[in-house]
């Protein structure tokens, strides 16, 4: 059972740590398209990996700077498997993808480029929430930051794909949920006949008080309502759903529902990408994971002194806590501060 101190520590931690994530690359039919998170790439990437927390902000559309096109556009066709690759820092085997405390759902939206850039016409084509006692983000971490969708049979043209993570480690308070998203520029070259529905506006698809946004993951729960519209069934037209939280109900698939092993590739072949199931299953009751704050402010108790040995933890990195097995010595000039029993962090002395 969580303590008042634990909640305060979790809230306090939000302002310092940056164990966050962005999309670094995309794979098409298991072929690595190379790093895309730069001005000469194909991902409209923000200047850093900080989250968006104001659901009314225009940055919710494609993140900070997301209205600015980038140099490249990936060519895809209906039926192609598109895999998004998230990372905390770099495309390396040692990268932790995102803090293990940042549990929550993973979703993908699609919109025609012009409408999507303006914040309109967004259609949810995939989602994964909480099922069988496991969060979508846990699956993402286990699969080395990869999750996949199948391109629907839409008309030829330019579109944006918008993968999104909602981290709920501070979702117990209004404004605490953290949103991570980017927009990937793609050009559909096949002549599909299934026009996207009208979609929803982003911002506008979520409210700060939606049950799937304002959600306490540290108390026992039996299900999780994934926020936003329902997943498009891939064939119907018209509205794709109203804003608010979608109940965990079965929908006709718009994307592949079976995980397929990837081909060996030069970058990170250690895991198989998750392929989303468009139907969410009712989650079973499970004891929630112990809170592990991922962010903080300069308060809390000092749990250890700073250090300068090789392999020391950098500023804002985790340096201790229950069940933590990594390095505990901070770089010179830093101290390891205890925010709660589960999360200690290197901060300025």
Swiss-Prot record:
Its EC number is 1.14.99.56. One of its GO terms (cellular component) is extracellular region. Its main location: secreted. O2 binds at residue 169. Cu(2+) binds at residues 20, 102, 180. Lytic polysaccharide monooxygenase (LPMO) that depolymerizes crystalline and amorphous polysaccharides via the oxidation of scissile alpha- or beta-(1-4)-glycosidic bonds, yielding C4 oxidation products. Catalysis by LPMOs requires the reduction of the active-site copper from Cu(II) to Cu(I) by a reducing agent and H(2)O(2) or O(2) as a cosubstrate. This is AA9 family lytic polysaccharide monooxygenase A. It comes from Aspergillus fumigatus (strain CBS 144.89 / FGSC A1163 / CEA10) (Neosartorya fumigata).
